[in-house]
Amino acid sequence: MEIGWMHNRRQRQVLVFFVLLSLSGAGAELGSYSVVEETERGSFVANLGKDLGLGLTEMSTRKARIISQGNKQHLQLKAQTGDLLINEKLDREELCGPTEPCILHFQVLMENPLEIFQAELRVIDINDHSPMFTEKEMILKIPENSPLGTEFPLNHALDLDVGSNNVQNYKISPSSHFRVLIHEFRDGRKYPELVLDKELDREEEPQLRLTLTALDGGSPPRSGTAQVRIEVVDINDNAPEFEQPIYKVQIPENSPLGSLVATVSARDLDGGANGKISYTLFQPSEDISKTLEVNPMTGEVRLRKQVDFEMVTSYEVRIKATDGGGLSGKCTLLLQVVDVNDNPPQVTMSALTSPIPENSPEIVVAVFSVSDPDSGNNGKTISSIQEDLPFLLKPSVKNFYTLVTERALDREARAEYNITLTVTDMGTPRLKTEHNITVQISDVNDNAPTFTQTSYTLFVRENNSPALHIGSVSATDRDSGTNAQVTYSLLPPQDPHLPLASLVSINADNGHLFALRSLDYEALQAFEFRVGATDRGSPALSREALVRVLVLDANDNSPFVLYPLQNGSAPCTELVPRAAEPGYLVTKVVAVDGDSGQNAWLSYQLLKATEPGLFGVWAHNGEVRTARLLSERDAAKQRLVVLVKDNGEPPRSATATLHVLLVDGFSQPFLPLPEAAPGQTQANSLTVYLVVALASVSSLFLFSVLLFVAVRLCRRSRAASVGRCSMPEGPFPGRLVDVSGTGTLSQSYQYEVCLTGGSETSEFKFLKPIIPNFSP
């Protein structure tokens, strides 16, 4: 047993030489079944499930089905029960003609796993045709001097049935001169010959009429009749003789009509009319009569119709030569039809799986069979597909192939393949057949959603309205269908203290993000969280992205003045010596703004002043300085209103009110002390005098010290202040008041100024200077 095949991976061609003998064991043999022709449609033939040893459900789940050559469905299989039934009435004569036995080959194909079982159905002949003679009357011219025992051939009857149902016997009507002798062709057909048993005498009986009856072997037998007319003629001594008893010729199939097949020749030694020969086909079958004709004068045998090797491979033709006297001779013409490569290969698709899942290698895509009615190399085939496809052709049993995937496929790279099966025979010239297959690739959830960005930065201005759409995230999935449907969700924040659920929400369908409440920049400047995108495949795949939300500041806070305090308490009064030079630092307005950026950039300007032009405010730092030299005409009490404004849109502002007291010298400061009640003044007059005297002495001493200090300070920094004092305009409390540097003069000398209580003539007490510690 030898199977010759060649598989070239680069060319993806499969060369398979199918030899009938070598394929006898290629697949599992199921067996042979038989059915009588003309059996009604739906009749039971066999139970394949039992023959294969399979259960009822296995036949159905494995998609068992019948495959017949040429797509003729003579049989049908009930997969639920395993019953093999007749699909249509079978006419044995139409299916097989004279061939006996009449066998129809079929296969049983089952999937998961792929198995093909070979089987055959034998169609049993019934006696449904009667014998028929091609001629209702046969004329024989028999010389009267014919010797006893001479045989005269008669036309045989035709019966489309085969075997015992074909013609089995011939009978002749009772006659004293003749009897019937039956002979048999090599193909089994029987033909009659008339045997002379008693001498003829033309003068007594010039003509005889007999009835020839043909009987078949059926039960009951059928019959057909023909008339035989015998004309007794005068003596003709010599019968025609052919030059060859057998002529063997070959003719290519598909030869044109009228092609010369052969020329037969006979001779007759008689002269005259008895030596004139005519040629005829002797007892031709219907097929031979339609295929060949002989020229009665020349003996040329020509084609009446084209011969087809695939239908009939050879003909056995008997030719009779008859002379003018009625004598005849016969020869046999053996005509061999030579095969020509005139049939392209045929592809029969048995199973096709589409779509097929991606990521699954070695999947059977299709099962098909290849056949070529030609013979020899003309019937050998090569099967192939395109080079650039991830598929392979594998030979299966007999003439079957399976088309399988070479590797795992990727639907995202290519969702459809158009495969062309090319089957070429080995004849000359080569003929080919192409069969197109479209294979769809079904999606498997093998791609996780992908965000368009790995991180998103969103900007939201504070004081937003709730449910404001602040931005969107977007993810795509290369899969298809439900595997590509993306659902968005918020992932738990990494910061457990971040109330993410109350800050933002996300639309699960489109990824839109919404602020759930109004955001406050001063409370939360920024926050971040993770968003997940999950597809709806099984199992579901997901991916996440980082979202940063930056809260943009809005100008929703007005400047707040830290110094001087504007809380409604007694205002602070700044002391300025009248000897101060222009640019003398009086104080510094300190303010802050809860906003940020430009909204927190503050500018200062003098809004109101008792003496316009006497003081100025630096716009960027809030320092209040003298604009010119002080004069005696300037009022001792000055009231300044400073406007503090931010740089927002629209701008917000606040005002600070300053009280400035112009003094001639620090030894005699002017203090707006409260006037004592008249009764108390009289009771403490002595104390008042003592206090005034002590104050005068102290003032002189203090003036000297301050003068010295002022000179030193002016050398160091003209921007430094010489002192600060809280001077309430109302009554002083009867306790010690500690006034420390709370203004902006943090880098200047500061003094602790204490007022002693207990007398109406309270005095200033200058203590040690407080010198701040500066970091190196």
Swiss-Prot record:
Keywords of the record: Calcium, Cell adhesion, Glycoprotein, Membrane, Repeat, Signal, Transmembrane, Transmembrane helix
Cytoplasmic side: 712-776
GO molecular function annotation: calcium ion binding
Disulfide bond sites: none
Superkingdom of the organism of origin: Eukaryota
Segments crossing the lipid bilayer: 691-711
Record bears the keyword Transmembrane: yes
InterPro entries the record matches: Cadherin-like_dom, Cadherin-like_sf, Cadherin_C, Cadherin_CS, Cadherin_N, Protocadherin/Cadherin-CA
GO cellular component, one term: membrane
Keyword Glycoprotein: yes
Membrane topology: Single-pass type I membrane protein
GO BP terms, alphabetized: calcium-dependent cell-cell adhesion via plasma membrane cell adhesion molecules; cell adhesion; chemical synaptic transmission; homophilic cell adhesion via plasma membrane adhesion molecules; synapse assembly
PROSITE patterns hit by this protein: CADHERIN_1, CADHERIN_2
Signal peptide: 1-28
Localization terms from the record: Membrane
Pfam families linked to this entry: Cadherin, Cadherin_2, Cadherin_C_2
Segments in the Extracellular topological domain: 29-690
Entry-listed glycosylation sites: N418, N436, N567
Cadherin domain ranges (all copies): 35-133, 138-242, 247-347, 352-451, 456-561, 568-671
Function: Potential calcium-dependent cell-adhesion protein. May be involved in the establishment and maintenance of specific neuronal connections in the brain.
Annotated protein name in UniProt: Protocadherin beta-16
Organism of this sequence: Homo sapiens (Human)
